[in-house]
Amino acid sequence: MKIRPVILCGGSGTRLWPNQKNYQAKQFINFGNWTLLGKTLERIKKKIFDAPIISTNYKYLKEIKKHLRKHKIKKYKIVLEPAKMNTGPAILASSLIKDIPYSQPLLFLSADHLMERQNIFYKEIKRYQKYLSDKNIFIFGIKPTMPSSEFGYFLTKKKKKIDQVIKFIEKPSKSIAKSLIAKKGYWNSGMFFIRKNSIINNFKKHQLTTYKYCQKAVLKSKHIKNIYYLDKNEFIKSTPKSFDHAVLEKTKEINAIKLNIPWSDLGSWQEICKMFDKNKKNLIKKKNIFYRPWGRYINLFSGKNFLIKELYVKPNGILSLQKHFHRSEHWLITQGLPKITLNKKKFTKKINESVFVQKGTIHRIENPNKKPVKIIEAQLGSILKETDIVRYQDIYGRVK
């Protein structure tokens, strides 16, 4: 039997756009002729997959249809959530729609993940499909590349040929993350591999109320062509919990599929800056290089309400002490040891460390060293022009 991919596409992207009204959900951000949702849709075009199901909300329907047309996916089903109830009800409702066989393997994917070496991903899916049962759940783990507090972790023990999950740790501190990596812990990617009957059995056992009302929401849904409009009155009676809290924390039959591949959920501007730093050779154009007394900057990519730059600060180069009215900035240090000023605070940052400059914050970058400093900068705001600079001090005489 083929595997049915279910793409969870209801996230709002507020982690990237805090306190901003006019933001774009992460899965739809155009990073230069590609989006994260587009990458996900391309990922499920293999012959091992059946037509996808997309779980989303009314707000994103138009954008999702646009993506489906662009990526030439003609067979699909869309399940529209009438209210935001977290991933537990979303996963269950998507599983309960008709035409899905009771024992159908379902692969739950986030719409906003980047993944390389996908052949390994496909190989592991096919390898573990035979172990799916009407009770167990397989989660995908990513081998950590660093001790991050941005992800949940899990630990496993070997049981026959399968890695059984014995403990979950939700977004630990960096020191605890280091100890988890030493114990061969993996990042919890948020992707699941499970049969339909296992989802039903687990929700009946651990979240009976949610099961009852999601089932009613599906039965009473309006089914127009390939879109299911879930019944709001029933759906909102389900318990608004994530799938992790609703089921994973309660069931004992959880197994792991461990992946050692480049992966990111681009959940922060630091991760986005890393992505652009990795691919900057393909983005640099002479017309986008601008020279300043302190060094130079290169505009790598301009998106909706954001701009990605690389700053090159020469030895002893000092940017002006300045602030912006219309933008905030995220800096990722990729080379050197810059001295940073944020209002009255002064500190030094190392490679791979980041700095957030809130709109209106007086700030400065200095390079007191003999080697150059390189920083990937993400500017976020309604106005991203060089005119949005108020200078207080400048060794090059640019204060007006």
Predicted regions and their residues:
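Glycine- and acidic-residue-biased ligand/ion/polar-headgroup-sensing regions
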Residues: 326-344
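Double-stranded beta-helix
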Residues: 364-400
